[in-house]
């Protein structure tokens, strides 16, 4: 079944709750969208959220790549060859992972809709659902505690807190957060490359009684080797984020002894589902746990990440909250959030429904 039409566009999506991380404040995000139609009318949609501060790709680059390559890549190609197209993109469009992700997700959506199955069933389901964390940006202690209580009251059971500005203040924050939310709420930390190895040891010792589940990307990604200066116990509970983009990165980080015990896969870093599954296979083979994370993204790509996560045996953690603070989106559905758990429906493809019809 051939792909007969392809369209792309971008839209600015404002956040209802701007937030800060270690190096900037985020108030709105511009996402790129790809819409494909097969000759029998079946459609598929994908989205991408370029993160220039992580991958070097901005929205202008995404648009340029799609303008120059989208139709050549997909028009008159058989949707059954979607994996070949994804593999080709990994070689030719390596510098634009969000643009690749938008195409990749649209292909996976169209293929699974064509087969009248949810994407996770096409990929091969390993899990039914997972708890997801919800993220609190860098804020004052009082603001953090207030937001944390709000999220707990909304049913979230895992809080991820951005840190990295001051290890002493971070320790105080985690202690007060634990006191505020009690022992039944899980706490994760994302240092966003803000620590040295000495800071990491100091933070781990200072929060040893607070039951921090793990810490994400504690050191700058050009200082990965410094992780060998900390104990194996700390490394096992550290997650590679900015240090892990491509399948090649996963292979390199899988070398013994492991620098990280957790891989944080984001479709906007990997370039979509196809390369993400390659990373996941490396993790599974190497005994490394998987976390699936995100940028600020449409429900489209969040749903894609969830379908992929539920298909991977090594998946252990979810941090797929990237669409929850969008003031608007282009679709509904795709995932179900209940009592902090994320699951997918039995709808075909990604399970998303267009709010407005796309004209091509």
Predicted feature residues:
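Conserved N-terminal glycine/acidic-rich loop preference
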Residues: 196, 211-212
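Active-site-adjacent beta->alpha loops and helix N-cap segments on the catalytic face
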Residues: 141-143, 165-181, 196-199, 219-231, ...
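Shared catalytic-loop signature of beta/alpha-barrel
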Residues: 211, 222-239, 244-341, 345
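A broad, low-amplitude sensor of folded, mature protein cores
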Residues: 35, 110-111, 136, 212, ...
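Glycine- and other small-residue-rich loops at beta-strand/loop junctions that grip anionic moieties
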Residues: 100, 136, 162-166, 192-193, ...
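Structural preference for beta-strand elements that scaffold enzyme active sites
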Residues: 33, 129-133, 157-160, 184-188, ...
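N-terminal capping/lid subdomain adjacent to the active-site entrance of alpha/beta enzymes
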Residues: 1-187, 192-194, 201, 205-208, ...
């Amino acid at each position: 079944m051939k792909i007969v039409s392809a369209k792309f566009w971008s839209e600015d999506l404002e956040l209802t709750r701007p937030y800060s991380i270690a190096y900037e404040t985020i108030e709105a995000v511009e996402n790129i969208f790809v819409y494909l139609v097969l000759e029998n009318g079946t459609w598929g949609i994908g989205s991408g959220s370029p993160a220039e501060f992580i991958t070097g790709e901005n929205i202008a680059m995404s648009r340029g790549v799609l303008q120059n390559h989208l139709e050549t890549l997909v028009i008159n190609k058989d949707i059954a060859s979607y994996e070949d197209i994804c593999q080709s993109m990994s070689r030719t469009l390596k510098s634009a992972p969000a643009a690749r992700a938008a195409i990749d997700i649209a292909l996976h959506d169209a293929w699974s809709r064509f087969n009248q199955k949810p994407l996770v069933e096409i990929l091969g389901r390993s899990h039914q659902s997972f708890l997801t964390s919800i993220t609190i940006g860098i804020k004052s202690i009082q603001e953090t505690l207030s937001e944390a209580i709000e999220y707990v009251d909304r049913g979230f059971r895992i809080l991820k807190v951005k840190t990295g500005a001051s290890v002493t203040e971070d320790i105080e924050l985690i202690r007060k957060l634990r006191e505020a939310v009690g022992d039944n709420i899980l706490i994760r930390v994302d240092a966003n490359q803000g620590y040295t190895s000495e800071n990491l040891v100091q933070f781990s010792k200072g929060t040893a009684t607070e039951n921090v589940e793990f810490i994400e990307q504690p050191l700058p990604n050009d200082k990965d080797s410094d992780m060998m200066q900390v104990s194996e116990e700390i490394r096992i509970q550290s997650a590679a984020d900015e240090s892990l983009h491509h399948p090649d990165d996963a292979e390199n980080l899988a070398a013994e002894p492991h620098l990280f015990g957790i891989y944080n896969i984001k479709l906007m870093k990997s370039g979509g589902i196809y390369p993400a599954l390659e990373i996941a296979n490396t993790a599974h083979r190497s005994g490394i746990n998987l976390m699936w994370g995100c940028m600020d993204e449409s429900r489209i790509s969040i749903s894609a990440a969830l379908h992929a996560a539920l298909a991977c045996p090594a998946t252990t953690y979810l941090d797929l909250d990237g669409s929850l603070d969008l003031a608007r989106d282009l679709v509904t559905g795709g995932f179900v959030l209940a009592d902090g758990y994320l699951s997918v429906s039995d709808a075909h493809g990604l399970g998303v429904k267009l709010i407005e019809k796309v004209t091509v």
